[in-house]
């Protein structure tokens, strides 16, 4: 959804997207991401595949990040919503990488037990590659973190979903409806909530 938002945000100049593992294996994420870009008519957007596992720092994604940091030194903002292996790889390729990046926004980490409808959830993004995470947190500048705990403060209800996405023929809205409608049934059945975080 973050990528969908950026694709539709006129204020953002999206330079590219890199795939990483975490919620699934890199090959599945890569295929899903490319299918989404194709279905949305965004195949001209540069997309690069990242490392497949912890510490796999040599990747097209890491090289792309270094190239973008060099080309847009002091201007580049990075949003990382998965494991941080690609950023760790960029730092391995260029020890001055983080000095060239304007800001980094991360989704990951927990600050207290993450309880989701009486179920304790494990942290995912930072724990996938602790070494890469340590590099980003200690070497990066202007790093903001949106933790799992922060995410639980905002529930996207079925009513809000209908209000924003039904009754429009906007291609992005149609795509989101087609790809996310099942989340409501899943969350209601598994967690007893009428929405998702």
Range-by-range predicted roles:
Residues 1-197:
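N-terminal acidic, glycine/proline-rich low-complexity segments
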